[in-house]
């Protein structure tokens, strides 16, 4: 359990290069739902058709989305300085406020193109093969302070509004989204495994409960280093994000559909990851997985 691990192990690399997936993984029919955080920075919307709110996935979130959109645009249109304070923007990011004022008319792009940063660079959606891209469209759900949650093929404009924001009239968005999410997310999860890779602010917006929690696995990435002959482990943001992105990519490329957290551990180990698992101590709790890394290439 102390061996070094890179994003893709030798066994995994051989499997993917040969285009084979273990038969036990291919037989599964249930969809794994992967919960991701958004990126703080985002790609420009570019030109194109504007947002069509009615076209977004999870229509049960439509009313809540409209309310957040209204409050955000109103704030940014009427009081730029207050908007900068509420959104937690530095002076150099003041231009993000102008983007928010144009959310209803700005060009919209697939969310998978909008979100950038370490996790999404490692995930590499644009370089997945066609089959893996279809899997990603079904499996990935990106949480958002503005939209609640979207699929990667949902077309959205670039925006600035994190889950930690407190909007006038709505309050803290993490708390605001809990009710709508509690209604919409269990249906999206279906009866399959939920792989929760969200950061704490976004995890606060929805926590699986009951039987659904028992088939949910959260992942923590630990960086292991030898210090004076003793192994020390810590959470390092870059390693955490990059490893999660590559882990999702490997699962998509392998076509793995583990039926539950225990089988997920087996799949990840087969893909070359060093995984330590802790089953929940009581009913209605999620599994906690630690992925231990020493370096990222």
Predicted regions: what they are:
Residues 16-31, 239:
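Short, Lys/Arg-enriched N-terminal segments with co-localized hydrophobic residues
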Residues 125-297:
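Internal, well-folded beta-alpha domain core
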Residues 1-23:
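Compositionally biased, low-complexity flexible segments
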